[in-house]
Amino acid sequence: MKKYIFNHVFFFLMLCGSNYLYSQDPWKLSADKPDSNNYYGETVANGMIGIISSPEPLKVKEVVLAGTYDIYKRGRVSSFIPNYNLLNMKLAFNGESVQTYNINNYKQELDMRNGAFTGSFQFKDLATVTYSYYALRHLPHCIMMVVNINTQKDTEINVENLLETPSSLNNQQNYFQNITNTHVNIPLLTSVAFTPTGRSKIAVSNTFLFDEGKKLQPEILHRMNDADMHAMSFDKKIKAGKTYSFALIGSLISSDHINDPYNEAERLTIYAALEGKSRLLNRHMQEWNSLWQSDIQVEGDPQAQQDIRSMLYHLYSFTRKSTSLSPSPMGLSGLGYNGHVFWDTEIWMFPPMLLLHPEIAKSMIEYRYQRLDAARKKAAIYGYDGAMFPWESADSGAEETPVNALTGAFEHHVTGDVAIAAWQYYLVTGDKEWLKEKGWPILKATAEFWASRVEKNDKGEYEIKNVVAADEWAENIDNNAYTNGTAIRNLQYASKCATVLGVIAPKEWTLIADKILISKMSNGVTREHDSYTDQNIKQADANLLAYPLKLITDKEQIERDLKYYQTKIPQSDTPAMTQAIFSLLYSRLEDSDQAYHWFKDAYQPNLNPPFRVISECKGGTNPYFSTGAGGVLQAVIMGFGGLDIDAAGGIKQVKSVLPKNWKKLTITGIGIEKKTFVLTH
């Protein structure tokens, strides 16, 4: 296999010259005649606001706001809150409302390159309507929908934007005003409410944006339905053969983001309105163009190209730089997993983002750093030293796992996962100042935890007892392979960090790491835990010692473990990450057929129509599973691409193999130097 590395920034845009197969357009996912009975929404997001599509025209199913949690109908722990729908629009022609049943030629399309969701339809013989909405990438709390109406006959339209306070919010107040001066008139439809316990205030504000000047724009009417609902609307007569365009702009923000969300929501809406549609779209597209400087291009497998780009799109959509936000397993695609942060971030989503966009990965690890004190408190109340990160984390950093799940008290490997991510960030970026200020406190505190967590046995070995494994079907077991492996790496990396910074680390860290128990069964296979015999497992565990931990490097051992545990994964009710690890390891073993088989098995059985969104399990109906996307992207980048985080710092390329039907794999914008890697047969 030939491998080429370019040190300059290289960006290649693969264009599809024909739309003969929508399913294989490298940048667009399309749905003709969306069927509400077989429809799983697509998400448009900017790392702060997520908008989930609806099969109904001019509607969205749900809006998700990152960073705001409260207790609501999901046990006694916090969760994302059902929020205001900013894009709740009604359109009528000559008094007849647009509905799914009275339109023709209905199509929806996600433009991944530009972060835009578009719907189009014909309303009887009167007009063709196209609408596109955006979670504006440069304005994290703002969205926009642009509507274009092309008339075939004279018609009069009525457009209404409805703000309804969801039942999850309390003590709502509704406001309407016109901001008027000599050159503009900006109508503001605003609602303010509190989360269920009153912990946070949420504010939303909408306005219409017209191409006409102040004197020609339609009159805006305000209507109060009841205490929970109000709307603004306008009428407009349009001549046959004309195109009429308008936009709806909205802002959504909470007291978790800023002290005064009510005023700031209105300020942001006014700002966006006066920026104007063209400037907003230009800035939005510039931001997406910048994101796509880091891309994956596949030649020879059009469907794989589209699917991989969809995975990139979703991870880019669910994250953003210069924040302390970190994605949940479902990203911003809904309320799944309560919006909590798990190990899914550090082990599955963080590595591809670290290589593609270190500045975004920095936000993910910043999330953990800001909650380090909470992790110290958890360690203390469980009788340990240092810092013990929660299995499920939200805004405070306290444990948020429902009490009926044993993972909250016993799945301790997440602490090592956080430390590993911190060290990887330093290796890729070489940011020594960050390492001193934030990386070292994380690595030191987590190493102190493991030093107090291990138990020395009669043989002088160190054991870690009574945990829930990465294979979560194994509860309250001793010496879980992956948990012990993360402890080893955590202690080793903390010692290395101390050396880099010229700090003296406790000698016991290295001594303990060298003697933590990793055992084998009589057949030579790495044993998942002390009481493991031959049970089925929920997900990869012992195999993770080969990657990402790289504690097992012998190829025969890696293959032995693969061939054993790949037979222990049931075909249903197991999460999508496992097969991605199998694919990655087979790529590095240069077994092309097995690598490609597990690559496809990692996500294709999990796809849902019409946009091929990924669910957590095979046949599942809970997309979008961004954890699975992160795993598959690692199979492509670190597996087929052979990219690897060098223990000495930076990114290197190890021996790997492409699928036989892939002619070429190009990975652009890697690391802080934005390198390009090209692989061919």
Swiss-Prot record:
Active-site annotation: E472, E616
pH dependence per the UniProt record: Optimum pH is 5.5.
Residues annotated for beta-D-glucose 1 binding in this entry: R74, W391, E392, T407, E472, K538
Catalytic activity: kojibiose + H2O = beta-D-glucose + D-glucose
Keywords, alphabetical: Carbohydrate metabolism, Glycosidase, Hydrolase, Periplasm, Signal
Entry EC no(s): 3.2.1.216
Name of one Pfam family that matches: Glyco_hydro_65N
Enzyme kind, highest EC tier: hydrolase
UniProt keyword annotation of Zinc present: no
GO terms, molecular function: carbohydrate binding; glycosyltransferase activity; hydrolase activity, hydrolyzing O-glycosyl compounds
Keyword Manganese on entry: no
Signal peptide segment: 1-23
GO biological process, one term: carbohydrate metabolic process
Temperature optimum or stability note: Optimum temperature is 40 degrees Celsius.
Subunit and interaction comment: Homohexamer; dimer of trimers.
Role summary: Glycosidase that specifically hydrolyzes kojibiose to beta-glucose and glucose. Also hydrolyzes, with lower catalytic efficiency, longer kojioligosaccharides (from kojitriose to kojipentaose) and shorter oligosaccharides produced by the degradation of dextran-containing alpha-1,2 branches. Probably acts on alpha-(1->2)-glucosyl isomaltooligosaccharides. Shows weak activity with nigerose but has no activity toward p-nitrophenyl alpha-glucopyranoside, which is a general substrate of exo-acting alpha-glucoside hydrolases. Has a strict specificity for alpha-1,2-glucosidic linkages.
Protein name: Kojibiose hydrolase
